[in-house]
Design a protein with these regions (language model features):
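Glycine-rich nucleotide/cofactor/substrate-binding loop typically near the N-terminus or early
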Residues: 39-109
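N-terminal glycine-/serine-/threonine-rich phosphate-binding loop
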Residues: 1-57
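Cysteine/selenocysteine-centered motifs that mediate thiol-based redox chemistry or coordinate metal-sulfur cofactors
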Residues: 301-302, 308-317, 442-483
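C-terminal binding/interaction regions
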Residues: 320-325, 330-342, 464-501
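Active-site/ligand-binding-proximal alpha/beta "capping" segment
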Residues: 83-132, 136-138, 384-389
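Glycine- and Gly-Pro-enriched alpha-helical subdomains that act as flexible
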Residues: 273-293, 417-463
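Active-site loops and adjacent core secondary-structure elements that bind or stabilize anionic groups
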Residues: 152-328, 332-335, 339-369, 391-400, ...
């Protein structure tokens, strides 16, 4: 056990005592001495175990109606002293301060008091001072001290005691310290939220660098961004970034990160309306724009390649809000900067967070960021006809786009160019029809194109419609109870299909 420490003295001061008896009993069996206050001391003594009063250690009684009980050098000195530091040990010996190896404390029920509708004075009295100080002190000195900061930690601590007694490893102490800081952070956030809005159960992100936006999604809404945009981008030109700009920028970054080869994408309302992968950035731009030159107006542009002068000259013919690239030639910047409000961003190499958050109802959804990028090895052929190598490349290409489109979504692509997509439809058939109509409006030939769907096909209808337009290769997750009907259609009509699920 790395840097093992044995618990000899425990300070216990809790508001909730349910489940504490098992821990106290086991600690007593291990020879641990107890130090406590008020009701907790009485509880320990009621179990038949001796317990020294904090007042006897400090020689000060609890004062100010209980507001000051443990706030004393003889308590905090015993917690914070560094056992391996000779100066600290000499001082606690000089002032007769006992070492405290374990702190078990919980906090006054601030949130519950707020939720009960109590008057403000009653709420203020539930702002814990001594408890939060004990938590932070013990957690800070986790090299020598174990901190149990809530009932939620009783079970893992009890299990630890049962496994190897009152001896702890540094890893265990550090884990409990981490949990303790989570408790203190949450508690302080709840207090902040009360004073900020009086809700008591609101969510506060642990982020700084608040940036006030011009407005939210609509002009009558206030908007803010919490985070560090400077770590993600250098804004080298243009107006202040808006709430809606940020939504599109986020979608653009998620999308372009799917591609390794030179790619250009145009987004409107968080969906790609044009995208192409090509040997040069100029070719990628031209073919991305060709996918939907109408919707591209006022869009957000993103590429994973350096923008040169020739490409900038072509881009400059279009009105757009934002452009994102890893870098720009000097001449390209001069051209693109001719429009004073145009937002020009240089993408840095900062990694995106591993988790994504979305607020809804009275809470927050959290999920891992989807970083999976399918390769040919991940595809499962479910049709008798195998896709060609070119079709596989196009299917993987289309799958990256549909993954980053609003469901229900269908993408039609050919030769690594987005021909058209149908997004945000309540019917998958309608999404396909929208994509077909759009592709035809820009005179694309769908023969030889591939289709990607962001979810399974419950019926063969979409495949049948696409087949009649000349689409002979389909990629989809699979997983419908009626998958076999779709697979059967493919076999009867010579359509190649692969699944990713």
């Amino acid at each position: 056990m790395s840097e093992a420490k044995r618990i000899k003295t425990a300070l216990v001061s809790v508001y909730h005592k349910e489940g504490l008896d098992e821990i106290i009993t086991k600690l007593h069996e291990e020879g641990v001495e107890f130090l406590s206050t008020g009701g907790t001391r009485q509880f320990i003594e009621s179990l038949g175990f001796p317990c020294k009063a904090v007042e006897d250690l400090t020689t000060y009684p609890s004062i100010l109606g209980g507001r000051v009980k443990t706030l004393h050098p003889k308590v905090f000195g015993g917690i914070l002293c560094r056992r391996g530091l000779e100066q600290d040990m000499q001082q606690i010996e000089k002032y007769e301060i006992p070492e405290i190896d374990l702190v078990i404390v919980d906090l006054y029920p601030f949130e519950a008091t707020v939720a009960s509708g109590a008057e403000e004075q009653a709420i203020i009295e539930k702002i814990d001072i001594g408890g939060i100080s004990l938590i932070r002190a013990a957690a800070k000195n986790f090299n020598d001290v174990v901190i149990i900061a809530s009932q939620a930690q009783y079970k893992p601590f009890r299990d630890m005691l049962l496994e190897h007694g009152a001896t702890t490893s540094r890893e265990e102490r550090r884990w409990f310290a981490k949990e303790a800081f989570a408790v203190s952070s949450h508690y302080d956030s709840a207090i902040f939220n009360y004073f900020d809005g009086g809700e008591g159960s609101a969510f506060r992100c642990a982020m700084e660098d608040q940036k006030q936006l011009r407005y939210g999604e609509n002009p009558h809404q206030k908007g803010y961004f919490y985070g560090n945009l400077d770590a993600m981008f250098d804004q080298i030109h243009g107006k202040e970034i808006s709430y809606n700009n940020l939504l599109d920028i986020n979608a653009a970054v998620d999308l372009i990160d799917e591609f390794d080869e030179i790619t250009f994408a145009i987004l409107k309302h968080n969906n790609a309306c044009g995208l192409a992968s090509r040997p040069t950035v100029l070719e990628a731009w031209k073919d991305a724009l060709a996918g939907d030159p109408v919707s591209a107006f006022g869009g957000v542009l993103v590429t994973n390649a350096v923008i040169d002068k020739e490409t900038a000259e072509e881009i400059n013919k279009l009105f757009f809000e934002v452009i994102i690239a890893p870098d720009y030639d000097v001449d390209a910047l001069e051209i693109l900067g001719q429009k004073k409000n145009r937002i020009i961003l240089v993408r840095k190499e900062a990694k995106l967070p591993k988790k994504q958050f979305r607020s809804l109802l009275n809470g927050v959804l959290v999920q891992e960021r989807d970083l999976d990028v399918e390769t040919a090895a991940d595809l499962k052929q479910v049709s008798e006809k195998a896709p060609t190598a070119a079709e596989v490349e196009d299917m993987l290409f289309a799958n990256k786009i549909v993954k980053n489109s609003k469901s229900n979504a269908i993408v039609l692509a050919k030769n690594k160019q987005l021909l058209a997509s149908g997004v945000g439809q309540t019917s998958r058939v309608d999404a396909l029809k929208q994509a077909i109509e759009k592709a035809k409006s820009f005179e694309f030939d769908l023969h030889g194109a591939v289709m990607a769907s962001d979810a399974f096909f419950p019926f063969p209808d979409c495949v049948e419609i696409a087949d009649k337009e000349g689409v002979k290769a389909v990629i989809q997750p699979g997983g419908s109870v009626k998958d076999e009907l779709t697979f059967q259609y493919c076999n009867e009509h010579g359509v190649a299909m692969v699944t990713t699920g």
